[in-house]
Amino acid sequence: MAADRQRFVVSGSVEEAETGRPLGDLVVRAFDRDLVFDDKLGYTSTDADGCFEIRFSPEDFRDFRETAPDLYLRIFDRAGTRLIFETRDAIRWNASPNERYRIRIPASALKPR
């Protein structure tokens, strides 16, 4: 079935909120929100311009009758260990096959703790 071969793309940019400075070399992870366990959809690092792109397929999120992911992102430091920012409070319910984000992170969240 053609729908089963459909690819989903989440892309966007990450910048410092106060200055608009692109934030490169951060880890971006995409998730599908579910009732029990959230599905990991993929991850990548931002480039020097703060841009990222993650591709995934319906098999990565499909449970029961789910036809579209309930999408959120988590942004980590370059090592992928410290959570800096997440969009879980603004989940994109039934996300489209092509979602674009502009993520603005406060400078205070970027400072090592």
Where do the PLM segments sit?
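Beta-strand-dominated extracellular/periplasmic modules and repeats
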Residues: A2-P112
